[in-house]
Protein backbone atom coordinates (compact mmCIF):
# COMPACT_ATOMS: atom_id res chain seq x y z
CA UNK A 1 0.00 0.00 0.00
CA UNK A 2 2.40 2.60 -1.27
CA UNK A 3 1.33 6.11 -0.30
CA UNK A 4 0.65 8.51 -3.11
CA UNK A 5 1.54 11.56 -1.16
CA UNK A 6 2.01 13.15 2.15
CA UNK A 7 -0.35 14.86 4.41
CA UNK A 8 -1.92 18.12 3.18
CA UNK A 9 0.78 20.43 4.36
CA UNK A 10 -0.06 22.99 1.72
CA UNK A 11 -3.20 23.63 3.74
CA UNK A 12 -1.11 24.90 6.63
CA UNK A 13 -1.20 28.64 7.15
CA UNK A 14 1.77 30.15 5.33
CA UNK A 15 3.79 32.38 7.62
CA UNK A 16 3.78 36.03 6.52
CA UNK A 17 6.74 38.05 7.63
CA UNK A 18 4.75 41.19 8.30
CA UNK A 19 2.59 39.48 10.90
CA UNK A 20 4.58 36.54 12.27
CA UNK A 21 8.08 35.32 12.92
CA UNK A 22 9.06 31.72 13.55
CA UNK A 23 11.58 32.77 16.20
CA UNK A 24 8.83 34.03 18.53
CA UNK A 25 10.39 37.45 19.11
CA UNK A 26 9.31 39.39 22.20
CA UNK A 27 8.04 42.95 22.54
CA UNK A 28 11.34 43.86 24.20
CA UNK A 29 13.24 42.74 21.11
CA UNK A 30 10.97 43.15 18.07
CA UNK A 31 13.82 42.48 15.66
CA UNK A 32 14.62 44.47 12.51
CA UNK A 33 11.92 46.60 10.88
CA UNK A 34 9.92 45.21 7.94
CA UNK A 35 11.73 45.04 4.61
CA UNK A 36 9.53 45.93 1.62
CA UNK A 37 11.43 43.84 -0.93
CA UNK A 38 11.45 40.76 1.29
CA UNK A 39 7.80 41.14 2.26
CA UNK A 40 6.67 41.72 -1.32
CA UNK A 41 8.41 38.60 -2.62
CA UNK A 42 7.11 36.52 0.29
CA UNK A 43 3.54 37.69 -0.30
CA UNK A 44 3.86 37.05 -4.04
CA UNK A 45 5.00 33.51 -3.30
CA UNK A 46 2.06 32.93 -0.97
CA UNK A 47 -0.36 34.26 -3.58
CA UNK A 48 1.15 32.01 -6.27
CA UNK A 49 0.90 28.99 -3.99
CA UNK A 50 -2.75 29.74 -3.22
CA UNK A 51 -3.38 29.80 -6.98
CA UNK A 52 -1.76 26.36 -7.38
CA UNK A 53 1.32 27.76 -9.12
CA UNK A 54 4.13 26.14 -7.10
CA UNK A 55 6.90 26.88 -9.61
CA UNK A 56 6.20 30.60 -9.46
CA UNK A 57 5.89 30.39 -5.68
CA UNK A 58 9.32 28.75 -5.46
CA UNK A 59 10.85 31.54 -7.54
CA UNK A 60 9.31 34.24 -5.36
CA UNK A 61 10.22 32.55 -2.09
CA UNK A 62 13.82 32.11 -3.25
CA UNK A 63 13.96 35.85 -3.87
CA UNK A 64 12.57 36.48 -0.40
CA UNK A 65 14.99 34.01 1.17
CA UNK A 66 17.97 35.63 -0.52
CA UNK A 67 16.85 38.95 0.96
CA UNK A 68 16.44 37.35 4.39
CA UNK A 69 20.04 36.11 4.25
CA UNK A 70 21.17 39.49 2.92
CA UNK A 71 19.83 41.22 6.01
CA UNK A 72 20.90 38.36 8.29
CA UNK A 73 17.42 38.01 9.79
CA UNK A 74 17.06 34.68 11.61
CA UNK A 75 13.29 34.97 11.96
CA UNK A 76 12.82 35.74 8.28
CA UNK A 77 15.18 32.92 7.29
CA UNK A 78 13.06 30.47 9.29
CA UNK A 79 9.74 31.81 7.98
CA UNK A 80 10.66 31.98 4.31
CA UNK A 81 12.53 28.66 4.36
CA UNK A 82 9.35 27.06 5.69
CA UNK A 83 7.28 28.69 2.94
CA UNK A 84 9.80 27.71 0.26
CA UNK A 85 9.86 24.10 1.45
CA UNK A 86 6.06 23.98 1.30
CA UNK A 87 6.09 25.28 -2.27
CA UNK A 88 8.76 22.76 -3.25
CA UNK A 89 6.69 19.99 -1.70
CA UNK A 90 3.58 21.09 -3.58
CA UNK A 91 5.64 21.13 -6.76
CA UNK A 92 6.65 17.52 -6.14
CA UNK A 93 10.29 18.18 -5.24
CA UNK A 94 10.66 16.65 -1.78
CA UNK A 95 14.46 16.49 -2.09
CA UNK A 96 14.67 20.24 -2.66
CA UNK A 97 12.40 20.80 0.34
CA UNK A 98 14.70 18.69 2.50
CA UNK A 99 17.70 20.72 1.32
CA UNK A 100 15.90 23.98 2.11
CA UNK A 101 15.08 22.83 5.63
CA UNK A 102 18.59 21.50 6.17
CA UNK A 103 20.19 24.80 5.19
CA UNK A 104 17.83 26.79 7.41
CA UNK A 105 18.38 24.50 10.39
CA UNK A 106 22.15 24.68 10.05
CA UNK A 107 22.06 28.47 9.88
CA UNK A 108 19.79 28.76 12.92
CA UNK A 109 21.76 26.23 14.94
CA UNK A 110 25.08 27.95 14.23
CA UNK A 111 23.75 31.20 15.66
CA UNK A 112 22.04 29.30 18.51
CA UNK A 113 18.63 30.53 17.40
CA UNK A 114 15.63 28.27 18.08
CA UNK A 115 14.50 26.05 15.22
CA UNK A 116 10.69 26.38 14.97
CA UNK A 117 8.43 23.36 15.13
CA UNK A 118 7.07 24.11 11.66
CA UNK A 119 10.47 23.51 10.04
CA UNK A 120 10.64 20.07 11.64
CA UNK A 121 7.10 19.39 10.46
CA UNK A 122 7.83 20.15 6.82
CA UNK A 123 11.06 18.13 7.11
CA UNK A 124 9.00 15.18 8.37
CA UNK A 125 6.60 15.50 5.46
CA UNK A 126 9.36 15.74 2.87
CA UNK A 127 11.23 12.80 4.38
CA UNK A 128 8.07 10.70 4.33
CA UNK A 129 7.40 11.51 0.71
CA UNK A 130 11.01 10.58 -0.07
CA UNK A 131 10.54 7.20 1.61
CA UNK A 132 12.79 7.96 4.60
CA UNK A 133 10.48 6.75 7.36
CA UNK A 134 13.09 7.02 10.11
CA UNK A 135 13.75 10.71 9.47
CA UNK A 136 10.05 11.39 8.98
CA UNK A 137 9.20 9.89 12.36
CA UNK A 138 12.06 11.58 14.23
CA UNK A 139 11.37 15.00 12.67
CA UNK A 140 7.67 14.71 13.52
CA UNK A 141 8.65 13.89 17.10
CA UNK A 142 10.90 16.96 17.16
CA UNK A 143 7.97 19.09 15.99
CA UNK A 144 5.84 17.71 18.82
CA UNK A 145 8.53 18.54 21.35
CA UNK A 146 8.65 22.25 20.49
CA UNK A 147 6.28 25.12 21.15
CA UNK A 148 4.43 26.13 17.99
CA UNK A 149 2.50 29.28 17.17
CA UNK A 150 0.22 27.19 14.93
CA UNK A 151 -2.30 25.00 16.74
CA UNK A 152 -2.41 22.60 13.78
CA UNK A 153 1.27 21.69 14.02
CA UNK A 154 0.83 18.98 16.67
CA UNK A 155 -2.07 17.13 15.00
CA UNK A 156 -0.28 17.22 11.65
CA UNK A 157 2.87 15.85 13.24
CA UNK A 158 0.81 13.03 14.75
CA UNK A 159 -0.70 12.41 11.32
CA UNK A 160 2.75 11.89 9.85
CA UNK A 161 3.71 9.60 12.73
CA UNK A 162 0.53 7.65 12.03
CA UNK A 163 1.40 7.33 8.35
CA UNK A 164 4.83 6.02 9.29
CA UNK A 165 3.30 3.53 11.73
CA UNK A 166 0.89 2.30 9.05
CA UNK A 167 3.74 1.84 6.57
CA UNK A 168 5.59 -0.21 9.17
CA UNK A 169 2.53 -2.24 10.09
CA UNK A 170 2.75 -1.01 13.68
CA UNK A 171 -0.86 -1.12 14.85
CA UNK A 172 0.00 0.05 18.37
CA UNK A 173 1.81 3.21 17.23
CA UNK A 174 -0.94 3.86 14.69
CA UNK A 175 -3.60 3.64 17.39
CA UNK A 176 -1.59 6.10 19.50
CA UNK A 177 -1.50 8.58 16.62
CA UNK A 178 -5.23 8.25 16.02
CA UNK A 179 -5.90 8.89 19.71
CA UNK A 180 -3.95 12.15 19.43
CA UNK A 181 -6.23 13.39 16.64
CA UNK A 182 -9.48 14.45 18.31
CA UNK A 183 -12.59 15.01 16.17
CA UNK A 184 -12.44 18.35 14.38
CA UNK A 185 -14.83 20.54 12.44
CA UNK A 186 -12.06 21.34 9.94
CA UNK A 187 -12.41 19.17 6.84
CA UNK A 188 -8.70 18.52 6.38
CA UNK A 189 -8.18 17.49 10.01
CA UNK A 190 -11.24 15.23 9.82
CA UNK A 191 -9.71 13.64 6.75
CA UNK A 192 -6.41 13.08 8.56
CA UNK A 193 -8.14 11.08 11.28
CA UNK A 194 -10.34 9.17 8.82
CA UNK A 195 -7.34 8.24 6.71
CA UNK A 196 -5.43 6.89 9.69
CA UNK A 197 -8.53 5.01 10.86
CA UNK A 198 -8.84 3.54 7.37
CA UNK A 199 -5.24 2.39 7.42
CA UNK A 200 -5.81 0.84 10.85
CA UNK A 201 -8.86 -0.99 9.49
CA UNK A 202 -6.76 -2.41 6.65
CA UNK A 203 -4.14 -3.63 9.11
CA UNK A 204 -6.99 -5.33 10.99
CA UNK A 205 -8.31 -6.91 7.77
CA UNK A 206 -11.52 -4.85 7.88
CA UNK A 207 -11.51 -3.84 4.23
CA UNK A 208 -15.17 -2.77 4.09
CA UNK A 209 -14.72 -0.43 7.06
CA UNK A 210 -11.54 0.92 5.47
CA UNK A 211 -13.36 1.59 2.21
CA UNK A 212 -15.99 3.70 3.97
CA UNK A 213 -13.36 5.65 5.91
CA UNK A 214 -11.23 6.36 2.84
CA UNK A 215 -14.24 7.55 0.86
CA UNK A 216 -15.21 9.90 3.69
CA UNK A 217 -11.61 11.11 3.82
CA UNK A 218 -11.68 11.78 0.07
CA UNK A 219 -14.86 13.85 0.46
CA UNK A 220 -13.25 15.91 3.21
CA UNK A 221 -10.07 16.42 1.18
CA UNK A 222 -12.27 17.72 -1.62
CA UNK A 223 -13.99 20.12 0.78
CA UNK A 224 -10.56 21.35 1.90
CA UNK A 225 -9.55 21.87 -1.77
CA UNK A 226 -6.74 19.36 -1.22
CA UNK A 227 -7.03 17.51 -4.51
CA UNK A 228 -3.70 15.74 -4.13
CA UNK A 229 -4.87 14.36 -0.81
CA UNK A 230 -8.24 13.51 -2.35
CA UNK A 231 -6.56 11.47 -5.08
CA UNK A 232 -4.52 9.63 -2.46
CA UNK A 233 -7.65 8.81 -0.47
CA UNK A 234 -9.39 7.56 -3.62
CA UNK A 235 -6.40 5.33 -4.37
CA UNK A 236 -6.54 3.92 -0.84
CA UNK A 237 -10.28 3.37 -1.25
CA UNK A 238 -9.62 1.47 -4.48
CA UNK A 239 -7.20 -0.80 -2.63
CA UNK A 240 -9.75 -1.39 0.15
CA UNK A 241 -12.53 -2.12 -2.35
CA UNK A 242 -10.32 -4.61 -4.15
CA UNK A 243 -9.50 -6.37 -0.88
CA UNK A 244 -13.22 -6.48 -0.07
CA UNK A 245 -13.90 -8.23 -3.37
CA UNK A 246 -15.73 -5.24 -4.84
CA UNK A 247 -13.84 -5.25 -8.12
CA UNK A 248 -16.16 -2.98 -10.11
CA UNK A 249 -16.07 -0.32 -7.40
CA UNK A 250 -12.30 -0.65 -7.11
CA UNK A 251 -11.91 -0.07 -10.85
CA UNK A 252 -13.96 3.12 -10.70
CA UNK A 253 -12.08 4.45 -7.67
CA UNK A 254 -8.67 3.69 -9.19
CA UNK A 255 -9.65 5.39 -12.45
CA UNK A 256 -10.86 8.51 -10.62
CA UNK A 257 -7.69 8.62 -8.51
CA UNK A 258 -5.49 8.23 -11.57
CA UNK A 259 -7.42 10.81 -13.56
CA UNK A 260 -7.14 13.38 -10.77
CA UNK A 261 -3.42 12.73 -10.37
CA UNK A 262 -2.87 13.01 -14.12
CA UNK A 263 -4.72 16.32 -14.35
CA UNK A 264 -2.59 17.60 -11.47
CA UNK A 265 0.49 16.83 -13.56
CA UNK A 266 1.59 13.84 -11.47
CA UNK A 267 2.06 11.31 -14.26
CA UNK A 268 4.30 9.06 -12.17
CA UNK A 269 1.46 8.45 -9.74
CA UNK A 270 -1.32 8.48 -12.33
CA UNK A 271 -0.09 5.80 -14.70
CA UNK A 272 0.11 2.91 -12.17
CA UNK A 273 -3.38 3.81 -10.94
CA UNK A 274 -4.74 3.86 -14.49
CA UNK A 275 -3.09 0.52 -15.18
CA UNK A 276 -4.73 -0.87 -12.03
CA UNK A 277 -8.09 0.58 -13.10
CA UNK A 278 -7.77 -0.98 -16.55
CA UNK A 279 -7.03 -4.44 -15.12
CA UNK A 280 -9.89 -4.26 -12.62
CA UNK A 281 -12.29 -2.92 -15.24
CA UNK A 282 -11.50 -5.79 -17.60
CA UNK A 283 -12.03 -8.27 -14.77
CA UNK A 284 -15.43 -6.76 -13.97
CA UNK A 285 -16.50 -6.17 -17.59
CA UNK A 286 -16.64 -2.37 -17.46
CA UNK A 287 -15.89 -1.26 -21.00
CA UNK A 288 -16.62 2.38 -20.17
CA UNK A 289 -13.74 2.52 -17.69
CA UNK A 290 -11.44 0.71 -20.14
CA UNK A 291 -12.23 3.34 -22.77
CA UNK A 292 -11.72 6.22 -20.31
CA UNK A 293 -8.36 4.80 -19.23
CA UNK A 294 -7.28 4.56 -22.87
CA UNK A 295 -8.25 8.20 -23.39
CA UNK A 296 -6.36 9.32 -20.30
CA UNK A 297 -3.26 7.39 -21.36
CA UNK A 298 -3.28 9.29 -24.64
CA UNK A 299 -3.45 12.54 -22.68
CA UNK A 300 -0.48 11.42 -20.59
CA UNK A 301 1.52 10.55 -23.71
CA UNK A 302 1.20 14.07 -25.20
Put a short name on every predicted segment.
Residues 13-14, 18-79, 83:
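N-terminal leader/linker segments that initiate helical-solenoid repeat arrays
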Residues 30-32, 70-73, 109-113, 147-151, ...:
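Short coil/turn linkers that connect adjacent helices within long alpha-helical scaffolds
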Residues 39, 79, 118, 156-159, ...:
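Residue register of alpha-helical TPR repeats
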Residues 43, 76, 83, 122, ...:
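"A position-specific structural signal for the A-helix of alpha-solenoid helical repeats
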Residues 63-67, 102-109, 141-146, 178-186, ...:
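Amphipathic alpha-helical segments of tetratricopeptide repeats
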Amino acid sequence: MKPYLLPPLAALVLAQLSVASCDGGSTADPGPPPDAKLDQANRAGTQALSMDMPSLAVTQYKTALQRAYERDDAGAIADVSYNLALAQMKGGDAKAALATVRDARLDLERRRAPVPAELFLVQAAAAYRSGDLTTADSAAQEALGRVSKDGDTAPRAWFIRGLVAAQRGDATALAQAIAKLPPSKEADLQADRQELEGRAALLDNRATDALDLFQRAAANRQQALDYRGMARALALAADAASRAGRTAEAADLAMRAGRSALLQGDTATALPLLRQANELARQSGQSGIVDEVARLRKVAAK
